[in-house]
């Protein structure tokens, strides 16, 4: 098989791992309100799961607050229920027609806990990328159409991609850690 066949598949899967990691770390609050924290949170609306961002206007009126204004006021209770199920360090205030989320300022101890959580997510993202490499390497080694030289070339190319995507993970990690530790 052609090198592009292998590399395109690897790029796609590794990019997916980086994107998943990026989404996960976006949900780690650095003491500042970030609308990404509530992206993807669903609640039931007329027996259908709906995401908050589909059913409400979301804004950040202050550095440590998110304001959710549902398009249909009847959904306020459902939104609050779904937010309560999330394990975020925030105060949920029902203001009738809207919901205000208040985030406390982070203590040094809490920042360190979040960095530990970040390290775990970082490691699992790297493991996912290495797993893609390992699976692809097995396929390359099983490909009987490839000569030894071609196999070595393909394996080297897969390793270069692995290094590139692990570097991306590390860059995201550095940025997030810096954000968490900035007071």
Swiss-Prot record:
Pfam families: RRF. One of its GO terms (molecular function) is ribosomal large subunit binding. Responsible for the release of ribosomes from messenger RNA at the termination of protein biosynthesis. May increase the efficiency of translation by recycling ribosomes from one round of translation to another. Disulfide bonds: none annotated. This is Ribosome-recycling factor. GO terms for cellular component: cytoplasm. GO terms for biological process: translational termination. It comes from the Bacteria. The gene is frr. The lineage of its organism: Bacteria, Bacillati, Mycoplasmatota, Mycoplasmoidales, Metamycoplasmataceae. Transmembrane segments: none annotated. InterPro entries: Ribosome_recyc_fac (IPR002661), Ribosome_recyc_fac_dom (IPR023584), RRF_sf (IPR036191). It comes from Mycoplasma mobile (strain ATCC 43663 / 163K / NCTC 11711). The keyword DNA damage does not apply. Belongs to the RRF family. Keywords: Cytoplasm, Protein biosynthesis. SUPFAM superfamilies: Ribosome recycling factor, RRF. It is found in: Cytoplasm.
């Amino acid at each position: 098989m052609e090198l592009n066949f292998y590399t395109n598949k690897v790029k796609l899967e590794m990019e997916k791992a980086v994107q998943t990691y990026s989404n996960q770390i976006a949900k780690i609050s650095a003491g500042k309100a970030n609308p990404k924290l509530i992206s993807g949170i669903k609640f039931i609306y007329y027996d259908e799961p709906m995401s908050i961002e589909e059913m409400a206007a979301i804004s950040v009126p202050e550095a440590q607050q998110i304001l959710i204004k549902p398009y249909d006021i009847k959904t306020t209770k459902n939104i609050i229920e779904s937010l309560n199920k999330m394990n975020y360090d925030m105060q949920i205030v029902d203001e009738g027609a809207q919901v205000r989320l208040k985030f406390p300022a982070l203590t040094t101890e809490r920042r360190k806990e979040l960095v530990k959580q970040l390290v775990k997510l970082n490691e699992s993202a790297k493991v996912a990328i290495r797993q893609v490499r390992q699976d692809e390497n097995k396929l390359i080694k099983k490909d009987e159409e490839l000569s030894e030289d071609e196999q070595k070339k393909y394996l080297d190319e897969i390793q270069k991609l692995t290094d590139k995507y692990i570097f991306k993970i590390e860059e995201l990690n550095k940025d997030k850690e810096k954000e968490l530790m900035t007071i």
